[in-house]
Amino acid sequence: YGLIYGHFGLPRLGLKGAAIAASSAQLVGAATCLGIFFFSRSMAAYRAVQWRLSLTRFRPLLRIGSDLAIRTGALRGSLVFATSCAARMGASVLSAHEIAFQLMLLGSDVIDGLAVAGQALVAKYLGSAQKETAFAMGKTLIRCGAVAGLIFGIAFLGAQDTIVSLFTNSTDVKLLLGAGVILWVALFQPLNGIVFVLDGLLIGAHDTRFLMWAMLIGGLGIFVPISWMALHWGWGLMGIWAGVGALMSWRLITLLYRFFSRTWSASQKQSGGMMSNPRT
C-alpha cells in the first residue's frame, strides 16, 4: 500500500511498488523459514548435516513431484492463457477478470486449509492401514468444504457492491463485474470448496498420476479452448468465466468419481507409503 500509493513516507512506485512489496514478502518469509529450520530445536532431527540420500526413498518422491509439477503447470498455464485472452479484450476486461480471480482465490485459499488437513490425515490413516477411517474422514471434510464454500458464496453476493468498490472506482469495470461475473464466482464457491478438499485428499493418498491427467485434460483440453473461443468468437469476459466453470465442473466430476471409487486407497502403498509434501 505504501509503495504503490506513496504513503508512510515511501515513494509512489505504482505497479513497480507492488512487485517490490511482493518480492520483499517472499524474501522475509523464506528467511523466517530458514531461520526456524536451522535454529529451532524442534527441527534438530531434520538438519541438513544429518541428511542421507536414499535412492530407494527418493524415487517415489520424484514420481509424485513430477506428477504434481505437470499438474500445477497445466493449471497455471491455462490460467495464464485465460488472462492473456482477457488482456486482449481491453484494460477494463482485464481489470474485471483479475478482481474476480482474486475473489475466487480468497475463498479457495482459505478452504485450502481443509485440503492440507485432509492430505495429512489421509496419509496418516492409510499409512497405518486404516482405510475406512481415511474414507470416513474424507467424506466429512468434503462436507466441510462445501459448507465453507457456501458461506463465501453468500458473502460475495451479499456484499457485492462493497467488495467491488474496494477494488475499483471504474464504472466500466463495475459494470463488467455486475453483469454476471461476481454471481458466477459466488455460485461456484461451494463447488470450489469440494474440489480443493478432494485435491488434498488424493494428494495425501499419493494418487497424483490421476490428478495430473485430470488437470491436463481439464486445463488444456477444456479451459484453454473455451478461453480462445471467448476471445475470437466475441463471448467476452463471461465466456472466459464459462471456461473457469467448465474446468471446475470437470474437476468436481472426476475427483468425486475417483474418491468414491476408492481405488486411491492403494496408491500410497504403491508409492512407498511416504507422506506427501504440503500442497502449494
What annotation goes with each model-predicted range?
Residues 10-66, 122-188, 229-280:
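Short alpha-helical transmembrane segments in multi-pass integral membrane proteins
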Residues 102-103, 216-225:
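Small-residue-enriched core segments of transmembrane alpha-helices in multipass membrane transport
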Residues 1-13, 73-106, 124, 164-171, ...:
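Helix-terminus/linker motif at the lipid-water interface of multi-pass membrane proteins
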Residues 1-5, 34, 80-85, 106, ...:
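Alpha-helical transmembrane segments of multipass membrane proteins
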Residues 96-160, 193-214:
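Small-residue-rich hydrophobic transmembrane alpha-helices
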Residues 1, 18, 76-77, 149-157, ...:
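Hydrophobic positions within alpha-helical transmembrane segments of bacterial inner-membrane proteins
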Residues 25-29, 33, 37, 55-117, ...:
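Transmembrane helical elements of multi-pass membrane transporters/channels
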